[in-house]
């Protein structure tokens, strides 16, 4: 069975989409190829790396990437994680489904916000897996 492709997108591919890629690979990896990208590339936020490390997921080797049109066009599902990405998502081919899962941006906020958003993303991906 070929794996489906899920592509997580946020503004800077720095926090939310990086954490979603980490959780996605752990939770969905048997059935899905998991990628992330951004409208811009801001670099991976060190606090996002630390937040995921706290739950045993290493995203320290991830890079912050702009949206890759090839991955985008070959995805089965594109998930936008913030309103900016939702509003500025490139046009998708008709065969690519899109969903919006909005999460607060933890960048520049207290550590507890990174933990909260990390856990909310995990819950959303676990919920997605069971539907």
UniProtKB/Swiss-Prot annotation:
The active site consists of 10, 82, 89
Q: What class of enzyme is it?
A: oxidoreductase
What cellular component GO annotations does this protein have? cytoplasm
- Localization (cell): Cytoplasm
According to the record, the signal peptide region is none
Listed EC numbers: 1.20.4.4
Quote the catalytic activity from the record. Answer: arsenate + [thioredoxin]-dithiol + H(+) = arsenite + [thioredoxin]-disulfide + H2O
Q: State the Gene Ontology terms under molecular function.
A: arsenate reductase (thioredoxin) activity; protein tyrosine phosphatase activity
- Keyword annotations from UniProtKB, A to Z: Arsenical resistance, Cytoplasm, Disulfide bond, Oxidoreductase, Redox-active center
The UniProt entry's GO biological process terms, in alphabetical order, are: response to arsenic-containing substance
Disulphide-bonded residues: 10-82, 82-89
The record's section on SUPFAM superfamilies has: Phosphotyrosine protein phosphatases I
Gene3D superfamilies the record matches:
3.40.50.2300
Primary location: cytoplasm
Instruction: Name the family.
Output: Belongs to the low molecular weight phosphotyrosine protein phosphatase family. Thioredoxin-coupled ArsC subfamily.
| HAMAP family, per database record | Arsenate_reduct (MF_01624)
- Function text: Catalyzes the reduction of arsenate [As(V)] to arsenite [As(III)].
What's the protein name? Arsenate reductase 2
Organism this protein belongs to = Staphylococcus haemolyticus (strain JCSC1435)
Which taxonomic lineage does the organism of this UniProt entry have? Bacteria, Bacillati, Bacillota, Bacilli, Bacillales
